Amino acid sequence: MSSSNFNEMNELNMTQTNYGSTKYTAQHHQGVINAIISSLTAPDQPTTVSLQYSNDKNMATEIQAYAKLSGPNWTYYVKDLEVSIGRNTDPLNSALQENSDGVKNSYRVNIDLGPAKVVSRKHAIIKYNMNIGGWELHILGRNGAKVNFQRTHNGPNNPPIRLSSGTLLDIGGTQMMFILPDSDPVVAPICIEHLMPNLINMFGLEGNNNPLLRDIIKQSNYAKQRQLTSNQQIKGFKLYGSGGNAPFGSGANLGPSEQGIFNNNNNSKNKNGYFTSINPNYTASTTTSNTINPQAASPQGPPNTIIAANFVDSYKSSNAYPQALDFTSDLSHDENRNVKPPHSYATMITQAILSSPEGVISLADIYKYISSNYAYYRFAKSGWQNSIRHNLSLNKAFEKVPRRPNEPGKGMKWRISESYQQEFLNKWNTGKVGKIRRGSSVARQLQLHMAKFNSLPMEMDYRLSLNMAQPPKRQLQSHNVLEPSNNNIIEGFVQHVPSKGNLPASQQSQPPVSHQNQSQQPPPQEQRQEIQFTFADTQNRNIALARPIKTPQLQAPNSNANLNQNNMKEYKESLHPPAISISQMNRQSPNNALVSFTNACANSKIINNISDSADKSTNNNGGTKMNLPAISTSSLDENGNLEPTTTTSSGNSNSVPQTGTTTSSLAANSLRLSQPYDTLLRSPTKAFHITAMEAYTPERGSANRARSPLHSNSNNTNNNGANNSNLQTSGMENKQTGLVLDSNVLKSMESNNDNRRLTPSTSKSQNVKSSPGVWNLLQFSSTNNTPAADSGGNKRGFSINPDIKAKENENATSEKDSDSNSNDLETKDINSSPLKNQGGSTANAKELILDTDGAKISIINN
């Protein structure tokens, strides 16, 4: 509920309010509270709580409880910090069920509002909030509830509703008041206005000789309106003539009442611009009709009728219009099945609702009313019924109400909203209802109904007739409840609600509890004994009333904040060590393509050793991290021979994978090419040798070949961007495919000594992938996918330049200790497929010949 409603509750302070010069005692306030509780409504069928906690059974004068919920004839004392409200499905005297441990389980709610099924099994919970020091209402049922006659939101996701002493609750048609022992109940003025018809019907305008109740009734808007009705000061707007079916006819067609309105010399125009007509021959009557039967309405108009002056002029002068039809009667005949009524759906819905004496009607009855009064909809298709449902749901003037308990049928009923009705009555009483703008069809129908009957069926509550069914018992109960000797109701009616959760000043000034003390709080059962209070006799003033202790909610001190920050800083530093420059690792690389390639393969072990730190290091140039694919390269063993080394990607998209890099990526900082040497970038067209282990590369055919660490290099100042991109992509292709150049080609390159680097790939191969079936054949050539072992020094029988082998030995010996995988392969003789087992003599060894241009593989004997 919004905060404005709570502010409105604080406006009515009966303890400090004097009506006239009369002083009110505590007994007067208690009598008003008892009168309000006795005027609360209840379902037709007695609820279980009214039978279980009837006031006849509460004979004790002193009961220890935290709070109480009072209904019209029952009282429930809250003795726990949490109370459930709902409907029990098992009988009241049924035995409790026992679980496997022998402990009795009770799924019963504390306050049973059954047997009406409009109440959910677990509809609401009232619990005490230790943090704020107050009681809260949690609504769980699908049909919701009303707090101080204002509908609230339901569901576990909605915030709870703060309760104060004097709050009125309406759950499933059962109204009750929440009362605290240490504060006088505060009843909102809007609640008194809603209950005023019941109060007047039960206690009359004199308020059962209670001066406070009498003054409250006299100051209410409902009593003032009823007094005007008793004096027959009826305000009406004659929109349609009641005689001759001629509202726009001449004066000869007017009835006696209408002629008296326009021809009477007693007509006068008041200050609001309305004509007032007084018929002296009219005999006052104190009875009013509560039905909307057109035949029951008298053809004679009311004696006092106030209509707009401009409407009178148009009424008298417009005699040229044809006679209007009485649509409510004529269009019901079958011969008018093709005549569509000139009414909106909201108008017909309002007519159907007003046709009920209680102002409440079901959806089926709305259909029945429209089809009975309008032949067009009786013979039309059922599409108009969907429009009726949409208007009921979307129009704020209509609201749903539950059925009575055990009432036949299903579904909710409909009525005109109470707020809309109250707004209309306020305009009606102030004379502003004539300013109805276009489209307000509901207000126009209410205006017509008030003009004929001077009352609305919604002015009575939906269940008021049920309460009035037993007037002697209710009257006797009201007299008994107003006696000062009643000990079940606490004294006082209105006390101003404190702004801080209804807490006394002593509790509001409490110092905050420390964190250590808060952690050592007693269990709720012990605290429950400390904060209990006593509902005592009004004569006994010496009994102390305690209130639940407010426990402030403290936040845990952030004493470990600096320590946590230091730990996090050290953890981040461990994850991000200083980056190692690639150019420093490759500082001694000579300017030769193959030597750079083999050195890069050897240096892959260095990179792999520092991969735990380098994979999370940031780029010094741009500060950004690059996503690089996993690369499989060949490294050198201690003898300088090529040995395959396979690495995989770490899977982290923000880190550098643990790979060995090739020539193009390591030596690209000082690499510059020009257009005339583009032909040297192409690989030889002759077939080159590839072994089984070289072919077994899981990354072969990867789509990430165009990605390279060279993308973040800012030192390359070559203006020819095409050559740079060509170099990067070709170098990456070399990485992925693991191509090995022929030794004869490399020797011819060294003899020329033209200081040009060669990347063994072609521009044609950059965009053309080899057949996937070829690589699958090579990858799965071995059953266990294990590398072949050699007993000799040269494990693969490659013809490598001695100078190159010497330079490779220098780099390979520095990583001898860290290369455990190479040592394992040297000491093991793995018997796998014939393609991998190439040890011993190479005379009978078979090699694979791969032609990249023709995508062919052939096996030859050495």
Curated annotation (Swiss-Prot):
Q: Where is the composition biased (Polar residues)?
A: 611-644, 750-770, 778-788, 830-844
- Disrupted-gene phenotype: Causes only a modest decline in CLB2 cluster genes expression, but this expression is abolished when both FKH1 and FKH2 are deleted. Leads to a defect in silencing HMRa. Causes a form of yeast pseudohyphal growth, when FKH2 is also deleted. Affects cell-cycle progression and CLB2 mRNA expression.
Query: In the record, which residues are listed under signal peptide?
Result: none
GO-annotated molecular function = chromatin binding; DNA replication origin binding; DNA-binding transcription factor activity, RNA polymerase II-specific; RNA polymerase II cis-regulatory region sequence-specific DNA binding; RNA polymerase II-specific DNA-binding transcription factor binding; sequence-specific DNA binding; transcription coactivator activity; transcription coregulator activity
List keywords of the entry alphabetically.
Answer: Cytoplasm, DNA-binding, Nucleus, Phosphoprotein, Transcription, Transcription regulation
Q: What is its main location?
A: nucleus
Where in this chain does the record put each FHA domain? 83-152
Region called Disordered, residue ranges: 498-528, 611-663, 698-730, 750-846
By its UniProt entry, which InterPro entries does this protein fall under? FHA_dom, Fork_head_dom, SMAD_FHA_dom_sf, TF_fork_head_CS_1, TF_fork_head_CS_2, WH-like_DNA-bd_sf, WH_DNA-bd_sf
Q: Which GO terms describe its cellular component?
A: cytosol; nucleus
- Gene3D superfamilies in the record, alphabetically? 2.60.200.20, Winged helix-like DNA-binding domain superfamily/Winged helix DNA-binding domain
Q: Which domain of life is it from?
A: Eukaryota
* DNA-binding region, residue intervals: 339-430
- Compartments it resides in: Nucleus; Cytoplasm, Cytosol
Q: Where is the composition biased (Basic and acidic residues)?
A: 804-829
Name a biological process GO annotation. positive regulation of DNA replication initiation
Q: What else is known?
A: Present with 656 molecules/cell in log phase SD medium.
- Copy the domain comment: The FHA domain is necessary for the interaction with NDD1.
Subunit info?
Interacts with MCM1. Interacts with NDD1. Interacts with the origin recognition complex (ORC) composed of ORC1 to ORC6.
Q: What's the stated role of this polypeptide?
A: Transcription factor that regulates the expression of the CLB2 cluster of genes during the G2/M phase of the mitotic cell cycle. The CLB2 cluster of genes includes mitotic regulators such as CLB1, CLB2, CDC5 and CDC20 as well as SWI5 and ACE2, transcription factors required for the subsequent temporal wave of cell cycle regulated gene expression in the M/G1 phase interval. Involved in HMRa silencing.
Protein name, as recorded: Fork head protein homolog 2
Q: Which organism is it from?
A: Saccharomyces cerevisiae (strain ATCC 204508 / S288c)
Q: Which gene name belongs to this protein?
A: FKH2
